Amino acid sequence: TLNINKMPAYAPFARPLYVMLKPASSLCNLNCEYCYYTEKSDMYRAQGAGSRMTLSDELLEKFTRQYIEAQTQPQVLFSWHGGEPLMRPISFYEKALRLQRQYARGHMIDNCLQTNGTLLTDEWCEFFRRNNFLIGISIDGPKEFHDEYRRTRGGGPSFDKVMRGIRLLNKHGVEWNAMAVVNDFNA
């Protein structure tokens, strides 16, 4: 068997291994026109996939243990993406943090999460601050650019909800950055 702990620290294992986790699969509360996950999410729903669309507790534990064990560097980054990762409850991420501590074995664990920001609440922001998450907010520029493609499931604009989420992050002192999709309308 391959034991990476006994391997010399050179390529290909000398660099950190990064993986994006999709705890809610393609589930999302928005219906962005350019998003390829929306179609996949609708397909899964039509097939009655239900709970198979989300990361199970069993798979979360297995992945966490194996991901940390595979690291040859002291720092491990868990990068939570979607769909919309806030479609999972805070209790899911509390369990993830417990598992990270359980399997850390001296590694420094960091967490970042990419969200559309519309589901942020005081409770989420307090959780992120307490646990030192870096939050990425998906926002495509000013209101008129953002709302062109980033629409709610009902077809309405989402910019004001994203800005409300950003204000909550600031209120709670949560570190955040922005990610924009450059497209034909905002370029």
Language-model segments: which ranges?
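Canonical Radical SAM [4Fe-4S] cluster-binding loop centered on the CxxxCxxC motif
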Residues: 18-56
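Short secondary-structure boundary micro-motifs
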Residues: 3-10, 52-54, 62, 110
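N-terminal charged/capping segments associated with class I S-adenosyl-L-methionine
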Residues: 1, 40-41, 48-51, 58, ...
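Radical SAM/AdoMet-radical enzyme domain recognition
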Residues: 60, 64-79, 88-187
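A generic fold-level signal
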Residues: 13-14, 27, 73, 130
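Short acidic donor-binding/metal-coordinating loop in glycosyltransferase active sites
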Residues: 82-83
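Flexible, glycine- and charge-enriched loops at secondary-structure boundaries
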Residues: 21, 49-57, 86, 152-159
